[in-house]
Amino acid sequence: MLIAGLIALRNRCQATRLVTVVFVASITIGLLGAYFHVVRGTYPTAPAGQRISINLLVWAPPIVAPLMFALVGLWGISAAWLENLPDSGRLDLGGGRFLQLPYSKSRAYLLMTSLAILATIVSGALDHARVNYENPWVWVPLFVGIFATIVTFGLALLRLPSRTDMAIFVGTMAAMIVVGLLGAVLHVRADISGQTIVTERFLREAPFLAPLLFANMGLLGLIVVLDPVERVVDEGSPIPLPA
């Protein structure tokens, strides 16, 4: 990506093609990773009806986690290709070619963010199922995540959201960030045993980085709703430029 960024300084079109290849590879890795995790968590030689179950998926490698590679690939491809006019959904493919999408890039980002939040809560739900939801704290990310998924998806469907819609969305994303940071603290506390720090517990017990994915989704959601038009000041006059 650093090389592509340097190339973009002189040839944006060539850099875009390069990063597209990289992000397609990321999507491929994500899909393959999810497949291998599912296979690792099943019993292919077991009798029919017992080869896959919820219990197997709970204790299997995280089946949803690799899909984040695929979502990052989609985000990257969407970001790499410029929108001819902000919020028009018309991508500039170079050479005078354009691709008209059914949604603007901003709305497409919101749809992808809602899918990413859904993947996050599914992964968290499977992880927390290992403790049978006995701790009331583990219910918080589930409820907040479900609400955030609905709010983000709903905002993506609105062509002209109101101020109230935006306020609810921003508040929800802020809640996601708080939940992520709080979850990371609770996971670290769970991994610390007594007065000693055992590295193995950080590897085998509560994953202290996993809750930060909630915070990442919250930050991403806030970035998505920023004004897609960049404005620079030239002799005191604001000039709109394509994002």
Which residues does each PLM region occupy?
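Transmembrane alpha-helix entry/boundary detector in multi-pass membrane proteins
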Residues: 1, 58-62, 105-106, 127-147, ...
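Membrane-interface helix-boundary motifs at transmembrane edges
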Residues: 10-18, 97-103, 158-166
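Interfacial non-cytosolic loop connecting adjacent transmembrane helices
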Residues: 36-59, 186-208
